[in-house]
Amino acid sequence: MSRRSFLKSSSVAAAIPVMGTTGSVLAKENSPANTGITLDYPETAVGNVNQLPINKPVNFNYPDSGSPCAMIRMGQAVPGGMGPNKDIVAYSLLCNHMGCSLNYEPASRTFKCPCHFSIFDSEKAGQMVTGQATEDLPRILLSYSEDTGDIKAVGVSGLIFGRQANIL
């Protein structure tokens, strides 16, 4: 191999990793998280405060039919709670570790994953307590009408499992 051929080959080999990094930097700079773009979530009626039992989940899908969620009236004010007593919260029912369906345990007021045993605290904004998950549960943002008692899902805080963006 001549010196000239060696230098050409070396230059190309050295440039390949740099080109890959440049592409990922450009993609990151143009992602919605870095451009200040907010996603337009649908407003979806999910219940009425007068019909919500205390500490019993009411299931619904949000922001689309592929995303199961649960709304719970805790019976006491909690962080991020909505409604007249600031005690109504909603979360995605997909564990953010591997996407398994979560079960609500009324006695401990936690969501438990039957697949890998992650536990999330519903009274502490879906905080991950233990297990394989590394993030808190995505919170479903709610709005409440004082006039009618109607509750609507209006957004998501956190990324729903298996998605690059919550709105498909």
Regions found by a protein language model. Name each.
Residues M1-P17:
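N-terminal secretory signal peptides and thylakoid transit peptides that target proteins
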Residues K28-N96, C100-P106, S143-L168:
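N-terminal pre-ligand scaffold of iron-sulfur
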Residues P17-V18, K112:
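A short hydrophobic/aromatic micro-motif that marks alpha-helical segments and, especially, helix-coil
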Residues L93-N96, T110-H116, F120-V154:
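Cys/His-clustered metal-coordination modules, chiefly Zn-binding fingers
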